[in-house]
Amino acid sequence: MASLDRVKVLVLGDSGVGKSSLVHLLCQNQVLGNPSWTVGCSVDVRVHDYKEGTPEEKTYYIELWDVGGSVGSASSVKSTRAVFYNSVNGIILVHDLTNKKSSQNLYRWSLEALNRDLVPTGVLVTNGDYDREQFADNQIPLLVIGTKLDQIHENKRHEVLTRTAFLAEDFNAEEINLDCTNPRYLAAGSSNAVKLSRFFDKVIEKRYFLRDGNQIPGFPDRKRFGGGTLKSLHYD
């Protein structure tokens, strides 16, 4: 297979929210049979057709970096984890729809990844305390994905999805809610698949067509997989 240009997308969120299952579904188009805790970082690759169906169509590698650990980790752990945040082109924030704390912690994950966890006292963890000015100048494309949609009782679904809609709005991001054990949520032509493709297109545009310093500062184009593993590819 010919070498392709690539972009790096972080997949962040609390342990147990289903990041590994999500990445496997995105890259292999299959349900992950035996999910396990991610230690360090695991890297999988998806092949994406930018502007599919247009004269500008071009194929890219999307590197999905599944970062393990807890957002409340000691500073030494955060320092070690920071190596994975170099030269990032996009961020997928993952939370468990049945666990409100995992949603609140996305603010802390995003601040950590964007190297802004040393500003203001009292890390922001709730929608009510969130200051959008913190991200006013952020140019890194974000996508919010809620997992375990199947575990929300029907009479609670409206309440939960209304709350998560505000969460995505805070990040100026689109949201996708799904069940990682059911591939139909990302079926070709579905609204979720369209949102996902639009996000990847935006990441590619920021990386290759808008050269104005939008990346997180780091080592330009250096591939640092750390303890991660490079796995097989999935075509859109």
Curated annotation (Swiss-Prot):
The keyword Nucleotide-binding applies. InterPro entries: P-loop_NTPase (IPR027417). Gene3D superfamilies: P-loop containing nucleotide triphosphate hydrolases (3.40.50.300). Pfam families: Roc. GO terms for molecular function: GTP binding; GTPase activity; protein homodimerization activity. One of its GO terms (biological process) is B cell differentiation. GO terms for cellular component: endomembrane system. SUPFAM superfamilies: P-loop containing nucleoside triphosphate hydrolases. Residues 1-236 are annotated as: Small GTPase-like. It comes from the Eukaryota. GTP binds at residues 16-21, 148-150, 179-180. Required for KRAS signaling regulation and modulation of cell proliferation. Regulator of KRAS prenylation, and probably prenylation of other small GTPases. Required for lymphocyte development and function. Not required for myeloid cell development. Homodimer. Interacts with GPR89; the interaction stabilizes GPR89. Interacts with RAP1GDS1. This is Rab-like protein 3. It comes from Bos taurus. The gene is RABL3.
